[in-house]
């Protein structure tokens, strides 16, 4: 069937901010689909609230909307753009839920929009647990015994009938949010109560437990003519009971017999058929009882998912692209296989290698959270590695995780840790074998298949052999074939990594590169996509004779280093291509656009370690390597690359070192006459106490060389300081801790700046909305700034100019400043792309990363900017021609843009929601408005914390904040809000003539503040931290397993209750001030105004 001619315009919904369970894979699949639809001749409209995405770049669609993903905003866009069809299968759970709501409210019918890619009843059959169960039973497929309940009593009754443990799954939630496993009645009460709140339809499914069964997934594709293929089988190394997003997975499945695989394949076809998926990709999960062979269908996703991104990268088969084309009427035998260029998409991929995916966790960011893995997803990113054998792929994947140090294991409790999996699970399996446990014993505790355990035990046996045969060439070869890195072998032999590298070179032990070609080398591949192996002879990655630039990616997503860096990398690749270079991408993250087969000229899917990068350099001999676009990951290895005489493109490594080393940096600032907050460094507790005494408390403590503020804190007392220094010493041994005077009540600014060595251009001047001391990655910010005088902006431009010239920046850099009493202080400078580059590019309409990349290969800045000139500048600044001054004019858009962050607190009940200098957000949204108030209000809606316009407010404000907070609360009372407050706050309000209802604090009588919140009477909580309330320490102190921090203050109880009840909360005076302005704006009239992104640049 050829493509459909009855539709011309297609609306695609993106997945919004990155959260746990919904990450960069949707930008990758969305970008792929947009390219496919445009090339098939359709007009495409994209809506997404996340500016850090390639899919919201204007060149991929006919109209881009960066607006909140709510039905109200979508209806406005549909009314304005009049699409013929809506494709909801590319934006994860978010887009599916919105499509269902748009259909059920009659909005799609009203504007004549048809759903393509998945029918409404199919989405419901797949997503509604009860309907899914009925549908499967009708099709003759076995599912787990389960019952849907909407209250606690029925849940308890069901659990008694099924017997504990039972699994609880809330309906229509993402990444298992609100679910869990209950082993007894007490746990059931707790999980069901939470689950009923989390589920948008307030129902949960109680399901019989299949803990310990094996879990498999099939990625399948079907077209309108009934053709059906399995793209990839994926086996979860971890058994059922751990969310598949938190499991180590292997493709293709290793322990299925052929008979079992055929049975599963047939079942998958029946599932798709019964649900009614006529076109597109789906992911189907099965559980298999290894004892009896009983197989049940667990669930299916009628959309592109995290697993389909993995399957695409593992096989080279672009599921999202194919699914988009199937949705508009093509069939599989009409779509080419883009990798071979010769076969069709109807061919099932076959692969002659093994792929391992391992999740990346960051539970240390959420003290008090339960580290045990269960059906609720907790990981923030993942890595993928390819090898010829399972051992080789596993070894490569483990080193791709970039875990700086081996996890501290609690060897006395190995058995307990094997039975209760945590993120360190795999380390405990290896530790068990090192301590003499056998495969049977470990299998009993973990239920990991014996085949995998035997493979892992063999690795430990090899380590023993290595110890016995030091410097033996044959054993070195074997270790390399089994996936061991030079560094690991060096540790076993007690020598340096360099010595092992030399030994390999002397004996000509090098990896060869093999191709990912979808067809096990049966046809010639057109798009070069490679992995390394020591299990091969022929090198398939034959370099061309073109000039090459190699770009290092940012590895697995994590807090502090997310999709924003991938965005910059991809823009870099395109720019270098436009300048005539061949581009080589190196990365290990399967979720990203950078690892798409058609982004760069050559893709190496490899770990970002010194060893792996040097081997690729040896093979490709690039003109230079780019380390400035991938966040901290490439910077960490830059030093070693320079030692091996690899050319670094852009800002020199010397400048990077000066900026990272506080002593050198302070010296440089002094030379050029700029200020930084007074500071000292300390290598011991005594020294730290001395330094802090001299500076005066509060002080900011942090280790050197770190991203995302790991182990950083604001400290008010010597006792707290002592605790922290002990902690930070663990983070970077051999590097001293830095202690800064903390500037209270300063305005913090974030500057993204570009320079070609002569000219300096501030691309984005952003003002942080949260007070100084909140990590800039966790603070909302606004562009252009709202509280700077003209004189101050000029001084900032001068300051930045001096610093950028002194650091000899070539390309892009990020500078953080604080302004206190009209004085400018430099907090830090990073001579690399920062996480705000995509936001700035979208706010000003100029692609910052692309310009920076071109400068790195010698282009001139004014000439590159002239393409976008004239752009809006500050009122009163007139510029006729670029380049008259070395300071180029700072863009000053007419529209205001607010970046707001999304923090996954609800995934970690037990963690306090106060913000501090340690970064904890996973993603971001952007709100655009005519003034700051509108932009802030839209950003709050987009981040899922919509501000109320009516109702009651609960206020409890610290003494130091009362002077500023009281008039703001009085404003809210004038706007008709009822105000409830605790004693001290109520007194301050009453003295200003504000009517208040006094509420007792916890322990002062009932009903107290917590009761009030639990009754659902409150629509907004304002609570700022008082100085007598210590912040929860942001790190866990290697306690016995599963113990929770003991400091539970009243403030903590209020904040966590608000979070649990989904009541919006404000924890700083700054955010309260912004919220008051936004609420006033919302009361005056609708803020549901939508504008094309490109129109916001023309205002």
Curated annotation (Swiss-Prot):
Residues 403-541 are annotated as: Oligomerization domain. Mn(2+) 4 binds at residues 828, 830. Pfam families: CPSase_L_D2, CPSase_L_D3, MGS. Residues 945-1099 form the MGS-like domain. Mn(2+) 3 binds at residues 816, 828. Belongs to the CarB family. HAMAP family: CPSase_L_chain_A (MF_01210_A), CPSase_L_chain_B (MF_01210_B). NCBIfam families: CPSaseII_lrg, PRK05294.1, PRK12815.1. Large subunit of the glutamine-dependent carbamoyl phosphate synthetase (CPSase). CPSase catalyzes the formation of carbamoyl phosphate from the ammonia moiety of glutamine, carbonate, and phosphate donated by ATP, constituting the first step of 2 biosynthetic pathways, one leading to arginine and/or urea and the other to pyrimidine nucleotides. This is Carbamoyl phosphate synthase large chain. It comes from Thermotoga maritima (strain ATCC 43589 / DSM 3109 / JCM 10099 / NBRC 100826 / MSB8).
């Amino acid at each position: 069937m050829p493509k459909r001619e009855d539709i011309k315009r297609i609306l695609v919904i993106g997945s919004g901010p990155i959260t746990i369970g919904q990450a960069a894979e949707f930008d990758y699949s969305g970008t792929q689909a947009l390219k496919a639809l445009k090339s098939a001749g359709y007009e495409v409209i994209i809506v997404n609230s996340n500016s850090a995405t390639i899919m919201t770049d204007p060149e991929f669609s006919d109209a881009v909307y960066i607006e909140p993903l709510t039905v109200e905003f979508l209806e406005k866009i549909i009314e304005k753009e009049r699409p013929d069809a809506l494709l909801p299968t590319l934006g994860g759970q978010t887009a599916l839920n919105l499509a269902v709501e748009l259909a059920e409210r009659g909005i799609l019918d009203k504007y004549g929009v048809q759903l393509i890619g998945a029918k409404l009843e199919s989405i419901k059959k797949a997503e509604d647990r009860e309907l899914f169960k009925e549908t499967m039973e009708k099709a003759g497929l076995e599912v787990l015994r389960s019952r849907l309940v909407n209250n606690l009593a029925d849940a308890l009754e069901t659990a008694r009938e099924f017997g504990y443990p039972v699994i609880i799954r809330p309906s229509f939630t993402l990444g298992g949010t609100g679910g869990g496993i209950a082993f007894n009645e007490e746990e059931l009460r707790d999980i069901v109560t939470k689950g009923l709140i989390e589920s948008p339809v307030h129902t949960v499914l109680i399901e019989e437990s299949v803990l310990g069964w094996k879990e498999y997934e099939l990625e399948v594709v079907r077209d309108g003519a009934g053709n059906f293929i399995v793209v990839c089988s994926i086996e979860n190394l971890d058994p059922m009971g751990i969310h598949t997003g938190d499991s180590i997975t292997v493709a293709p499945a290793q322990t299925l017999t052929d008979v079992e695989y055929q049975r599963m394949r047939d079942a998958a076809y029946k599932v798709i058929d019964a649900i009614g998926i006529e076109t597109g990709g789906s992911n189907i999960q099965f559980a298999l009882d290894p004892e009896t062979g009983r197989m049940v269908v667990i669930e299916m996703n009628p959309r592109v998912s995290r697993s389909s991104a993995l399957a695409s990268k593992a096989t080279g088969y672009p599921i999202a692209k194919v699914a988009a084309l199937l949705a508009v009427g093509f069939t599989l035998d009409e779509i080419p296989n883009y990798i071979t260029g010769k076969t069709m998409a109807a061919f099932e991929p076959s692969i002659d290698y093994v792929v391992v995916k391992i999740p990346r966790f960051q539970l240390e960011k959420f003290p008090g959270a339960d580290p045990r893995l269960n059906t609720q997803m907790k990981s923030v990113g993942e890595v993928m590695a390819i090898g010829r054998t399972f051992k080789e792929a596993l070894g490569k994947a483990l080193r791709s995780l970039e875990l700086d140090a081996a996890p501290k294991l609690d060897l006395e409790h190995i058995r307990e840790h094997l039975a209760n999996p945590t993120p360190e699970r795999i380390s405990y399996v290896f530790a068990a074998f090192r301590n003499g446990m056998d495969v049977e014993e470990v299998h009993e505790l973990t239920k990991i298949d014996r085949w995998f355990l035997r493979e892992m035990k063999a690795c430990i046996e090899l380590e023993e052999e290595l110890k016995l045969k030091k410097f033996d060439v044959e054993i070195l070869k074997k270790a390399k074939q089994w996936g061991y890195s030079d560094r690991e072998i060096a540790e076993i032999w007690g020598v340096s990594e360099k010595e092992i590298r030399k030994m390999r070179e002397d004996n000509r032990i090098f990896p060869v590169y093999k191709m990912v070609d979808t067809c096990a080398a049966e046809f010639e591949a057109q798009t070069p996509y490679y992995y390394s192996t020591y299990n091969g002879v022929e090198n398939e990655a034959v370099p061309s004779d073109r000039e090459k630039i190699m770009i290092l990616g940012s590895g697995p997503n994590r807090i502090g280093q997310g999709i924003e860096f991938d965005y910059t990398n991809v823009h870099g690749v395109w720019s270098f291509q436009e300048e005539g270079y061949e581009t080589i991408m190196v990365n290990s993250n399967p979720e990203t656009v950078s690892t798409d087969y058609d982004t760069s000229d050559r893709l190496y899917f490899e770990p970002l370690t010194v060893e792996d990068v040097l081997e690729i350099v040896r093979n490709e001999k690039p003109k230079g390597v780019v380390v400035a676009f991938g966040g901290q990951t490439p910077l960490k290895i830059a030093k070693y690359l320079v030692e091996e005489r690899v050319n670094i493109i852009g800002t020199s490594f010397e400048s990077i070192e000066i900026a990272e080393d506080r002593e050198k940096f302070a010296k440089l600032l002094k030379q050029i006459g700029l200020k930084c907050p007074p500071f000292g460094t300390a290598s011991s507790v005594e020294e730290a106490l001395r330094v802090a005494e001299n500076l005066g408390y509060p002080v900011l403590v942090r280790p050197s060389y770190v991203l995302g503020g790991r182990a950083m804190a604001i400290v008010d007392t010597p006792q707290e300081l002592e605790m922290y220094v002990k902690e930070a010493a663990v983070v970077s041994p051999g590097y001293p801790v830095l202690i800064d005077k903390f500037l209270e009540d300063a305005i913090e600014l974030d500057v993204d700046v570009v320079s070609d060595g002569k000219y300096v251009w501030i691309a984005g001047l952003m003002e942080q909305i949260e007070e100084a001391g909140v990590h800039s990655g966790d603070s909302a910010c606004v562009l252009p700034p709202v509280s700077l005088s003209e004189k101050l902006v000029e001084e900032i431009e001068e300051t930045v100019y001096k610093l950028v010239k002194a650091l000899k920046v070539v390309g892009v850099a990020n500078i953080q400043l604080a302004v206190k009493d009209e004085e400018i202080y430099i907090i830090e400078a990073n001579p690399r792309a920062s996480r705000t580059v995509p936001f700035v590019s979208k706010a000003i309409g100029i692609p910052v990363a692309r310009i920076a990349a071109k400068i790195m290969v010698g282009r001139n800045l004014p000439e590159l900017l002239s393409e976008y000139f004239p752009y809006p500048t500050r009122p009163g600044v007139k510029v006729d021609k670029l380049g008259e001054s070395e300071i180029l004019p700072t863009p000053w858009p007419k529209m205001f843009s607010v970046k707001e962050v999304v923090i996954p607190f609800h995934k970690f009940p037990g963690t306090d929601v106060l913000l501090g200098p340690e970064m904890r957000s996973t993603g971001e949204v952007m709100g655009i408005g005519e003034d700051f108030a509108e932009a802030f209000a839209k950003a709050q809606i987009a981040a899922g914390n919509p501000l109320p316009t009516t109702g009651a407010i609960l206020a409890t404000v610290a003494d130091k904040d009362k002077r500023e907070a009281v008039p703001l609360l009085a404003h809210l009372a004038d706007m008709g809000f009822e105000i409830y407050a605790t004693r001290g706050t109520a007194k301050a309000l009453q003295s200003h003539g504000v009517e208040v209802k006094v509420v007792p604090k916890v322990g002062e009588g009932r009903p107290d503040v917590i009761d009030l919140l639990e009754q659902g009477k409150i629509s907004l909580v304002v609570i700022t931290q008082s100085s007598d309330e210590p912040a929860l320490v942001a790190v866990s102190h290697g306690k016995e397993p599963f113990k929770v921090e003991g400091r539970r203050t009243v403030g903590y109880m209020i904040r966590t209750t608000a979070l649990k009840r989904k009541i919006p909360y404000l924890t700083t005076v700054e955010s309260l001030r912004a919220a008051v302005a936004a609420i006033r704006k919302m009361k005056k009239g609708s803020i549901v105004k939508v504008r094309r992104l490109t129109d916001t640049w023309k205002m």
